């Protein structure tokens, strides 16, 4: 957590980050952390809200829970990649079940990377600092 406190928000461009997670405690923790890093955050707790908010907010990065109650994260990732203003959005899958099949399906659906919950704050900070490449 110390690395987060050393980050100067003005040192890097602010990103728009959408958190898609049905666990409100996890959403709150990630949102606070990402705001401390100097980024703008919105969140959705289900797939329908995720699509709606993504269309309006146009995030540069989406942290997407694979196991949502209404849609699988794979389906959301595929849908987002077809959206005209979102096809270049970086989608990072997060899952409580980091099995190889989950990873494979997430990558096939358009996710850039897959991480187990909870995400390490230093890894999250590095991901948000990185440009898509």
Question: Where are the regions a protein language model picked out?
Answer:
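Non-catalytic signal-transmission and effector/linker regions of two-component phosphorelay proteins
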Residues: 1-18, 122-133
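Active-site beta3 strand of CheY-like receiver
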Residues: 57-63, 68
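Two-component/phosphorelay signaling modules centered on CheY-like receiver
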Residues: 24-42
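The feature encodes the CheY-like receiver
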Residues: 69, 87, 99
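Hydrophobic residue at a beta-alpha junction
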Residues: 44-45, 68-71, 80
């Amino acid at each position: 957590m110390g690395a987060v406190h050393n980050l100067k928000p003005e040192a890097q461009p602010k990103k728009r980050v959408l958190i898609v997670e049905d666990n409100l405690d996890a959403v709150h923790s990630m949102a606070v952390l990402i705001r401390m890093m100097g980024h703008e955050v919105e969140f959705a707790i289900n797939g329908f809200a995720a699509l709606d908010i993504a269309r309006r907010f146009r995030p540069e990065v989406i942290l997407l829970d694979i196991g949502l109650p209404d849609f699988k994260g794979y389906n959301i990732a595929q849908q987002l990649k077809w959206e005209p203003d979102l096809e270049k959005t970086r989608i990072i899958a997060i899952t409580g079940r980091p099995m190889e099949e989950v990873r494979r399906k997430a990558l096939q659906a358009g996710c850039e990377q897959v991480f187990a919950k909870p995400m390490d704050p230093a890894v999250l900070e590095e991901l948000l600092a990185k440009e898509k490449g």
